[in-house]
A protein has these predicted regions:
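Eukaryotic scaffold repeat domains enriched in small/polar residues
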Residues: 4-7, 18-206
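Sec-dependent N-terminal signal peptides
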Residues: 7-13
């Protein structure tokens, strides 16, 4: 019986030691992970003077940004979201800045031959340097422009949303991407429809 008690006591002490060691190991691991996480998280500071917008203009809600092959920043913003007092100073919807934040050019808005989005949503600069614009208001189209703002092509028609089977119109397209090797335009047509639809980036053919 005495040996039994001794055995139980030894086993109990061993178990306590294992638990204590395991707990200490977990605490050390958690502490190390916490320390690593703190050192790995970068700290950012907002640069209030970047980008440098002409003083005559006011920027509204920014819906999308893109970077071209020159590392220029392209901004798509929504002038209609400004207050009535600020709207006269609204900057154009499309703004281009260089890598240092210097203003390059601006353009966009309603024009002849295309349906400008009711609500500006997405901007993308493809490998050939064309600028694609999409909307998510009553917008069932995407627009293609040169970097200088010259209209090139429209796929779809505003207010003509139908179903996933429609290959001519979109339904508030969320985003686009051009695969350079095949020159195919991939459209994430997912707000209204639930699909990825592909067009020829030059002709707009399905």
């Amino acid at each position: 019986m005495r040996k039994t008690f001794q055995t139980i006591a030894i086993l109990s002490l061993g178990i306590v030691a294992v638990i204590a060691g395991g707990q200490r190991g977990l605490e050390e691991t958690a502490s190390a992970q916490a320390g690593a996480a703190v050192t790995q998280i970068p700290r950012f500071r907002a640069e209030g003077s970047w980008p440098k917008l002409p003083s005559k203009w006011v920027m509204a809600i920014v819906s999308s940004t893109g970077i071209d092959e020159q590392d220029h920043l392209w901004v798509l913003q929504r002038p209609n979201t400004l207050s009535p007092e600020e709207k006269p100073k609204a900057a154009p919807p499309v703004l281009e800045f260089d890598a240092e934040g210097n203003f390059i050019q601006a353009w966009g808005g309603p024009g002849a031959g295309y349906d400008w989005p009711e609500t500006e949503h997405g901007i993308y600069i493809d490998p050939k340097g064309f600028v694609w614009i999409g909307g998510n208001g009553n917008d069932d189209q995407i627009l293609k422009f040169t970097k200088a703002g010259k209209f090139v092509m429209q796929i779809g028609k505003g207010g003509q949303k139908k179903t996933n089977a429609d290959t001519k119109n979109l339904w508030e397209p969320a985003d686009v991407f051009v695969y350079a090797k095949t020159n195919e335009l991939f459209v994430a047509d997912v707000y209204g429809n639930k699909r990825i639809i592909v067009f020829d980036a030059d002709t707009g053919a399905f």
